[in-house]
Amino acid sequence: MANELKKYILSAHIVLMVLLFSACNGKSKTSFMQEGGDTLNLRYAENLQIVKYQHYTQVTLRNPWDTLKTLHTYLLVNKQDSCPSSLPEGTIVRVPLSNSLIFSSVHCGLLQELGALDKIKGVCDLQYIRVPAILESCRKKEITDAGSSMNPDIEKVIDMHPDGILLSPYENSGGYGRIEKLNIPILECADYMETSALGRAEWVRFYGLLFGKEAEADSLFAGVEEAYLSLRNQVKDITPKPTVITELKTGGTWYVPGGNSTMAKLYADAGARYIFADIPQSGSASLAFETVFDKGCLLYTSPSPRDRQKS
């Protein structure tokens, strides 16, 4: 039974990681209401809304830490078109992006799946990236290594002239420092704060719009959805449900996904019982090593030894 569950959990991980993998110069416009838009039907993503209008697409990100507020609004305008004179409030992004800076290894993998690796011109945290084509392009200096995502090399960022920066936002981060002053659209990828694996995966439709890969993104998500739901159905009646923990100890602290997180939902859908499912949050929680160790469990998932060695 344990081996069978490991297989299903691994399969679910693979399905998830397939994905998880300006002006006009990016300036904001004054606010007013628009009518007549076509809202995309998003079945799982709770923090994402996409509305298509004749001359632009409005993407609204709900603040996952305060769901009554908006995290960010983007107005996607095709590069081939003139920028409309009247737009609602939001950050204008000229699409498709062709010279992007990617902070997260997850989104590097995602762009590989979308066939958009040629749109990446810079990355951060190169030590965590496992995409051979990106590593080779960095070696050849075709892709810029901009250093740490926590403190990117601002001179390198300026030199590469990115048309968009994809990064993961954090609660109470205090902003993005000097990079915010470069007048480059910052795309806040809050997909990891969704409360289901399919909710996070559905953000691929947003990324498809950013990189001119809408059809590819829709097809990719449809395949992932079908595979995921099939796996979930295969294990829904398994009893007893084996216990599982995840992640690694960092220093004296063990960071674990909250009970409302994508990973917690993934384990539940895979037929397992996540031992910290009662932690009421979507992000990670910091626990003492002894607290985790004393729980005991049947299954344990973590980054590979190679990833751990290079992290």
What is each residue range found by the language model?
Residues M1-T30:
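Bacterial Sec-dependent N-terminal signal peptides
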Residues C24-C108, E216-V244:
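Bacterial Sec-exported substrate-binding components of ABC uptake systems
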Residues W65-I158, L167-P169:
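A short, structured surface patch at a secondary-structure boundary
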Residues A116, L182-N183, A270:
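Short, structured coil segments at secondary-structure junctions
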Residues E142, D153, D159-L166, N172-T253, ...:
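Extracytoplasmic substrate-binding proteins
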Residues N151-H161, L287-G296:
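Short helices/loops that flank or line small-molecule/ion binding pockets
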Residues G258-G259, M263-G283:
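Alpha-helical, coiled-coil/dimerization segments enriched in small aliphatic residues
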Residues Y300-P305, Q309:
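Conserved small/polar residues in nucleotide/adenosyl-binding loops
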